[in-house]
Each structure stands twice: as C-alpha cells, then as structure tokens.
Amino acid sequence: MKIHKLCFLALLLAHTTSAVNLNLNLKTSELVFLGDAELGPASDGVSRSGALSMTRDENPFSHGQSLWSTPVPFKPSSNSSSPYPFETSFTFSISTRIKPAPGHGLAFVVVPSIESDGPGPAGYLGIFNKTNNGNPKNHIFAVEFDVFQDKGFGDINDNHVGININSVTSVVAEKAGYWVQTGIGKMKHWSFKEFKLSNGERYKAWIEYRNSKVTVTLAPETVKKPKKPLIVAHLDLSKVFLQNMYPGFSGAMGRGVERHDIWSWTFQNSAKRI
C-alpha cells in the first residue's frame, strides 16, 4: 500500500510533553495518505473539493487512511496508566450511489503507526483485516460512522455510530442522530432526532475522552453542539494507547460507490501529568 505525503489544510501543531493542539483551517500543511485517501476531487472532476476523501469512486472496494504525519503523545510514558484527556471535532459527509448497495462508512482513528498492516475494505472500514481483527496488540481506538449493516460484525443497523477498540465490532453503538431539549422550566424534556448518515449532508462530530469516559456527540453541521451526547461509555484506554500515537481518519466501501469526506478537523490533547 502506497503512502502519500501531500500539502493540504493547515494543521498547526503546538507540542509540549503534555499538550498537543491540532487545528485544520483549510490552508496548507502535511498529512500522510495511505491507500486510496486523497485530497478529494470537486464535482467537476477536475478541481479539488478542499475535503479529505478516504475512498475513490472509480475503485471498487476502495479504502484509505489519512493520518497526522508526526506522532502525538497520548500518555506521559509507555507504562503510564493515565492517558492524556483529549477532544476532537470534525465535519464530514458520506455520499452514496444506490446501486449496487453502498457502504460501508468512515471512522476517526487513533493508530500506533503510519505503516499500515494491510487494512481491509468493506466492513473492515480501512482499519482492520481478517487476520488482525480483535487482536489486543492492535492498539487501535476508533469511532465509526457505519452505513452498512454487517451482522457478522454485530452491527445494530445500517445507520449507526460505534466505539471500537482493537476490533471492527463495536463495544457500544447507537443509531445515528442527536438529542434536542424542548419545553420550558419543569416541562423540559429530551427528544431524539435521527438522521441518515449517508444522505450527503454535512454533520459534525465531537469526541472527548477524560477520566476513563468517552463521549460522542453528533449533529447537523449548522446545529450547535447538543448538551446531551449520543454515546457515553466508561472505557479504560490505558492499555490501548501507546505513549505516542497517530490520530486521523479511515474509510472504506464495498462494491457500491460511496464518498467519505472530511471537511474540517480540530484535535486537542491537553493534560497534566498524574
């Protein structure tokens, strides 16, 4: 699998031993592209859209990754049991063509290296493969945005968000959507609004990890961050994260054509040593 380095959107790196800030502001910088990932083409097929694209229309079973090109500290030391808290947000879209059945989805990933160990297409989401799926030595954390139900991987439906640790099978998953609070005073209540991830619209995701708790919040791009997360999961990632890791994105499709685009991205890792 080829590794491409490409000047892309400005991810500004402010780095100390205990803090990292990445900001993507649609200008210039360097990412690492693996597989079919690229700076995506615009609808005219000639110019570039300004988005990171994980898959290519012309390649059946296309899959790829785009990662930050330098290692980011996720723990104070290799044997630390206290990973740094982190938060990331990004805007994405998934666009499909109906025939054949589209799939499969994209994911925010944190991986131990940029040397890919043969990630697979389709349900493996460009992260895992048949051989390494489920291996605790993978040291991979991911949040998937899955638009194809693969019952063999335990998918709850064809439109869900899940947290994955070393496996394409999610440890927790919820149908895609967001929470809205309505009413006044004591009459306030939460209502859930479901939406289709693969309708081509842009959505924004917020992922946070602190005190062994992962929260995932999702909403349409034009909606402010909901106060109630879509997913709250108590997970100890101290055995998953190595001292240095590479954050980024992956995506994969099957026979059907599907675009997986990232339009903006911020990442912050800021923590005191414990």
UniProtKB/Swiss-Prot annotation:
Molecular-function GO terms, alphabetical: carbohydrate binding; kinase activity
Family listed: Belongs to the leguminous lectin family.
Source organism (scientific name): Arabidopsis thaliana (Mouse-ear cress)
Pfam family name, one: Lectin_legB
Ranges for region Legume-lectin like: 28-268
Record's note on what induces expression: Strongly induced locally by salicylic acid (SA). Completely dependent on NPR1 for early up-regulation by SA. Up-regulated upon avirulent pathogen infection via an SA-mediated pathway. Up-regulated locally and systematically during systemic acquired resistance (SAR). The local induction is independent of EDS1 while the systemic transcriptional regulation is EDS1-dependent.
Protein role: Plays a positive role in the effector-triggered immunity (ETI) response. Involved in salicylic acid (SA)-mediated processes occurring in ETI response, but is not involved in the autophagy process. Promotes systemic rather than local immunity. Essential for systemic acquired resistance (SAR), but not necessary for immune signaling downstream of SA. May act in parallel with SA.
Predominant location category: secreted
Name of the protein in question: Lectin-like protein
Subcellular location: Secreted, Extracellular space, Apoplast; Cell membrane
Residue positions, PTM Phosphoserine: 238
Signal peptide: 1-19
UniProt xrefs under PANTHER family: CONCANAVALIN A-LIKE LECTIN FAMILY PROTEIN, LECTIN-LIKE PROTEIN
UniProt keyword terms in alphabetical order: Apoplast, Cell membrane, Glycoprotein, Kinase, Lectin, Membrane, Phosphoprotein, Secreted, Signal, Transferase
Gene Ontology CC terms: apoplast; plasma membrane
Disordered as annotated region, ranges: 62-81
Tissue: Expressed in seedlings and leaves of adult plants.
Residues with glycosylation annotation: 129
InterPro entries registered for this protein in UniProt: ConA-like_dom_sf, L-lectin, Legume_lectin_dom, Leguminous_Lectin
Gene Ontology biological process terms, A to Z: cellular response to salicylic acid stimulus; response to bacterium; systemic acquired resistance
SUPFAM superfamilies: Concanavalin A-like lectins/glucanases (SSF49899)
